[in-house]
């Protein structure tokens, strides 16, 4: 279930997208696997939840790799992100911590005490995390995720089934996480990807 299906033949792949008040649900069917992704922001919270449910409609056990991908901006200021690209690339990096990718803006200032402000450039952190399963591989670099001569229709990390465990430093950042699950015939499993802008310690509590 995806906003952009990864190059499947529409004779075999079916999808449906529904928008409601405060949520979007995308369902898909392919090769006897049914998936539903529900996107929403919990009431009173400041992060997104992407709840993904996968059901095995075949008559045998299936081994699946589930992946989520979020493309970060390099700066919260539009002008800096879109115009001053050399600068915004320089100040962006990603880290992997347990069950999440953390993107740092002005990460080069991370050695400065948390409450000390340098030229109004405190370190800003965004996160893309996984709840309900263990991360099997990750990628924090957009170019590494897509791969050479690949695009969003066939990203190398998805085609290979392994995201390569790469982070980004002075490049275009992203958050990509994969997990491996086994479903018995008729079984359903639900996991959740979470996306937001919070310090790492707060992100850990959100995902827990």
Residue ranges and their predicted role:
Residues 1-208:
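Anionic coordination/interaction segments
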């Amino acid at each position: 279930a995806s906003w952009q299906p990864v190059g499947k033949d529409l004779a075999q792949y079916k999808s449906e997208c529904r928008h409601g008040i405060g949520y979007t649900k995308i369902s898909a069917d392919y090769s006897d696997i049914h998936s539903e992704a529900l996107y929403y922001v919990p009431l009173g919270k400041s992060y997104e939840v992407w709840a993904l449910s996968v059901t095995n409609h075949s008559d045998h056990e299936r081994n699946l790799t589930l992946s989520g991908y979020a493309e970060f901006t390099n700066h919260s200021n539009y002008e800096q992100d879109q115009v001053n690209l050399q600068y915004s690339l320089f100040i962006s990096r990603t880290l992997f911590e347990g069950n999440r990718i953390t993107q740092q803006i002005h990460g080069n200032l991370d050695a400065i005490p948390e409450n000390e402000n340098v030229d109004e450039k405190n370190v800003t952190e965004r996160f893309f995390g996984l709840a309900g399963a263990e991360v099997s591989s990750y990628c924090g670099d957009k170019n590494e995720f897509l791969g050479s001569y690949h695009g969003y229709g066939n990203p190398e990390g998805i085609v290979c089934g392994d995201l390569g465990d790469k982070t980004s430093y002075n490049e275009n950042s992203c958050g990509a996480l994969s997990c491996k699950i086994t479903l018995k015939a008729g079984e359903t499993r639900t996991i959740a990807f979470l996306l937001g802008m919070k310090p790492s310690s707060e992100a850990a509590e959100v995902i827990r």
